[in-house]
Amino acid sequence: MATRPLSPAQFSRRPRFLLRWYYWLLLAVAVAYGLAFAMHWDDRGVLWVQERFESPAERKESVWLPDYHAVIDGKLLPGMEKDEASDLAYNPQTKTLFSVMGKNPFLVELTLQGEVLRKMPLMGWSNPEAVTVMENGLLAIVDEREHLLSIVKVEAETRELHRDAFPKYDLGPSEDQNKAFEAITWDPRNQQLLLGEERPAALFSWKSDGSQTLTGSKQKLVNGELDVRNLSALAIDPRTGHTLALSADSHLLLELDEQGEQVSFMTLLRGFNGLSKTIPRAEGVTIDDAGNIYMVSEPNLFYRFEKQ
């Protein structure tokens, strides 16, 4: 039986159908890419694959962020709704936390449960964005806007701090002057301060013996470029020497080994690691000597994570 040829009407409908299908496919791809970009799946995909290659022994010797679960989830820091929590640091001597507020400059001391113990105005600071605890009651504070690092002394009776009373160090220019040094942590093993530029994310070191005197000048780390959209904060795990690097824009917390290689990560989105809501803008992270992790987010949210 002979095959009946397509009529002109049928022939014209087929290309139009194929064209519509092609446009719908392009739209679906564009939507999927936009969703992946917005949810930062592009950041996490490679990290997840890298995690699969870590051996059980390597996981045991690391912080291993996938095992952490939020036990304090977005607790409000009272009276700080308009102050913009910018960083967080653990003090092993007092077993308390210190946080800097960037919008209205002050230093606050917190319990490990996020209760406020005292607030200390930071007189002379313009935009304090990073803080770390060093030795003997010393804290290093970074003013991002003025590119200055100050090393201050905080004692039990301290009620306010005046920047001009303490040593200051010029951090120099940044590739993006408006997205300069926003992260700092004390590295006691290597006797240095570890500094982080926000964007493009990069790590620097500055030698120190833990006193108010820094040696030489800051040095950019060869392996200090991070594959995140920005760098918000840094912390050093006192047990392993590994670095925690926080990115607010990527909604990620990374664990890096002492060679700067990524070991594990935590995603800061709702439904992951016990979070009931996405952390809106994580700006500070620290870890205590028991391995508990603490974070602050703008405007005034407090988080505590414990290993399960």
Predicted regions located by residue number:
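Sequence/structural signature of beta-propeller domains
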Residues: 2-308
